[in-house]
């Protein structure tokens, strides 16, 4: 088990497994921060950031609280741009009940001067060792309560725009394990459709609900991908339905999805815009037969 971080961590300001992300752009922000007079952070909430009435401007330094839902720190890379990307997601759990506006992604990008032969993901993990925020993200545990300070940001994603918190120059304060663990929101898988066609346009539910924890009940699987072990679910076991991305499950060890037509009492996962929209279960326990 990872050790809980009980101290404030501050990035060194050095710079901001699996399939490559299918999106129109990666996080390339590399802001200049004056550490002598850092801007005061605006205290807000994840629900307020995701609200249609949100008026907070991109780049505003904000402070929010949430509970970690990521089973691990997600790492990707772009060797052409020379960046490593790190991500975790959190949800607001108070006040209850849970809503589809509870989730948000924490992102960090670190510049890498050169790549060597070998795994880019491994090199990005090594690069993270010199940045305190990147290491703090890696130390986070599911169910951990955290206070986050970073910059409100958005990202162009598969023809849509998603919200996130840029952790460049940010802070993470661990507050121990949450008293109120995340609760999934019951949702309809036929509403969470992966974008297809040309040009692809991200479904509004993924832009509006990214990072939310959802649960589909009494569904059947279809469309199994034998390479990546992803599959889709719907009430009837046929399209339309939601794509279940198994990235987290495969990253935690060997995973093979079950045959098409498998019935699940429930499938729980994180709403993510990666690959133009999918639901990522956190662990195998999120797939209940």
Question: Whereabouts are the PLM-identified features?
Answer:
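Bacterial N-terminal signal peptides that target proteins for export
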Residues: 1-8
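C-terminal motif of bacterial Sec signal peptides marking the signal peptidase cleavage site
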Residues: 14-17
């Amino acid at each position: 088990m990872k050790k809980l971080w009980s101290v404030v961590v501050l990035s060194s300001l050095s710079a901001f497994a699996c399939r490559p992300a299918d999106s129109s752009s990666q996080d390339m922000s590399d802001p200049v921060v004056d550490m002598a007079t850092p801007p005061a952070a605006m205290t807000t909430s994840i629900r307020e950031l995701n609200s249609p009435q949100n008026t907070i401007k991109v780049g505003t330094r904000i402070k929010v609280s949430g509970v970690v839902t990521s089973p691990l720190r997600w790492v990707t890379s772009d060797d052409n741009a020379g960046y490593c990307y790190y991500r975790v997601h959190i949800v607001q759990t108070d006040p209850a009940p849970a809503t589809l506006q509870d989730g948000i992604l924490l992102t960090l990008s670190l510049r890498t001067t050169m790549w060597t032969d070998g795994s880019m993901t491994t090199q990005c993990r090594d690069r993270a060792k010199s940045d305190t925020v990147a290491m703090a993200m890696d130390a986070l545990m599911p169910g951990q309560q955290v206070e986050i300070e970073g910059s409100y940001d958005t990202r162009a994603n598969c023809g849509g725009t998603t919200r996130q918190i840029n952790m460049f120059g940010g802070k993470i304060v661990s507050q121990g394990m949450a008293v109120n663990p995340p609760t999934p929101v019951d949702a309809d898988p036929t509403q969470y459709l992966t974008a297809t066609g040309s040009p692809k346009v991200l479904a509004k539910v993924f832009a509006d609900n990214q990072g939310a924890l959802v649960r589909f009940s009494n569904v059947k699987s279809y469309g199994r991908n034998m390479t990546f072990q992803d599959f889709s679910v719907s009430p009837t076991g046929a399209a339309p339905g939601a794509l279940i991305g198994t990235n987290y499950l495969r990253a935690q060890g060997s995973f093979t999805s079950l045959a098409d037509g498998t019935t699940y009492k429930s499938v729980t996962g994180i709403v993510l815009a990666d690959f133009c929209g999918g639901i990522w279960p956190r662990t195998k326990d999120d797939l209940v037969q």
